[in-house]
């Protein structure tokens, strides 16, 4: 079937289903007959376009069924019975279903998700039969316990839980007029909230009823039993809803008792046009049951519709630079009129002045009931679900300006108004889209637990984050939906602000990497990065090339430190697979360390860099290696280097010795990866940007084959430290020496450090120096040890004479001398100040500095 024919066939079927609902809600025999004939005619038109034999048989049967029913309505004395729908006449939605076999742990996660706010919501299995709602003679109506919680202001006007007939009798002034509750009504509805703070829920209900009224929905949303397709209430007062939350569709059972009020204010959603319309209040009660009670402050309508319908939620931040009216309109207009997307919208925080001038409510959700375009002008019909709303925003002029547009209603309900698309983008903050999952053919779900008490990573570091491989052979559109499972909100008397703080202070996001399904360590280099949202869901839309595997990372900010369950769902036009991301490296070692006052040496330009924590890495076979430095203090910028140093401590930084490093200093985590590292002993140095920055860190050493990693002791470990006086080389003098005495045979290391270099009063860089250890002086002196292989050096970390042995009693041979010789500065004008640190097994003595000519 061609695409235009398929679209037309769907339109005829949708109109036929709307006519079916009109039959059940008809108030006269003539209305019912006309609607039945209308249903038959639309099924006939759809049949003429059908090309699949199975569809032809089904549509032919529906056409004959409604011709027969029209005849019965016309001839029967009890036309209401003939007009009444049966549950089987309303088709179940054909949703994509995940076929992946769940693990035992995933099944446990779904069972854990059934317990919520003191109730049990089991996963949906099969549709309930009519026997479940029967009520025998003399049997009391079904009563669900315990009663839902009310807030303190609500309890002040609360007048008890009452059945719909009691509520309607109370609100009916004429005692001779009996108003009966119904589950469907003909024509338009006008749903509003009053005392409840659930604007997001009521806006969601307005969006779904509007879609039904436009005939753009092929099934009742949300799904309710026993009244799908019937206007008659449940005989027993029991209702079962099919809601999607905590990883699957679940069964939500309620009774029909609603909270009544002592005043004219209502404690539940009402239809101002049809006060006896029971369906909205029951949907609201069922939803509030799983969200903790009637004191629910509201979330956002995208989340609410996700639960009510199972339609895929997407949040669009209207003030983002990349969101334009043209792009948004083109994306939504056709889908909206095909019934494939529900639209709601929310304001941000507005001042009282802005609320007065704009006629909008701060941090409030609205429903979008219609979209239209005429003469280049794009408008949306917006409804405020609050009962006290004005007709329209005060100064946008949209009402008077839209009268010349086609199909404009002759009148508006209070709180309903047309608004230009560009003004809507300007005055509202968030647009919530809920997409019909039937637009996708394939789905795959993964359920998992994130232990945030022990497995929380630092910002920008993903080593502890849940990661998954998402692959597709054919490529195409793939949508990834991350859902955080609802948890019990707390004690019944919890403060409202505490409830909201728990809901709004935590954020989740999705990152996507082109990493072939292998785990990644840092957030850098993401192919796609989703925004951090305070909703329990976030959507990532992808276009995947054929034969591609992406790595998907779940990220969070400020979630409570406990076990949190999630579901990650992939929706696709082609088969898609999800699995846990594989570790790139087979062997992983985790080492704890810290920067202390004695080991916080700063970056490689600091003279104290060699004091930083260092580790020996020993490798016996060629291997790829990854070094990840993770620091929980996100104020510290960190860095990691890998040196060729034969496994010894690094005392000076030379570019020829650096094998790899992590690049710029980075907050949170630093990563260096080296492929095909040859066997040998190497040294790892972990540093912060500045000296004296203290903190803990974790070093993750990963490799393809086993390797050995061990901390290197500090340079002064097991040694006595002696520091000389400051020696000064004034201009024109380039050599000085000091005596060195040892009490017994000892091993010693010497380090010369510059303390100041000036020309006049202006600081300059130190002069390159050479340090030697000499036996005696004069023509017969003997050089025992030298620094830097006999070359002059101005290394910021100091000039070193590595370990050598000295014995006492050499005074008769001229004594032992530490000699510092420099290459003079420009014109011989530099004054250099140096000190020498001796690290020896025994305490040594360094004499006063003596100046000599070079």
Swiss-Prot record:
Its EC number is 3.4.22.-. One of its GO terms (biological process) is proteolysis. It is an enzyme of class 3 (hydrolase). GO terms for molecular function: calcium-dependent cysteine-type endopeptidase activity. The active site is at residues 199, 364, 384. It holds the Pfam family Peptidase_C2. Required for the proteolytic cleavage of the transcription factor pacC in response to alkaline ambient pH. Probably is the signaling protease that mediates the first proteolytic cleavage within the signaling protease box of pacC. This is Calpain-like protease palB/RIM13. The lineage of its organism: Eukaryota, Fungi, Dikarya, Ascomycota, Pezizomycotina.
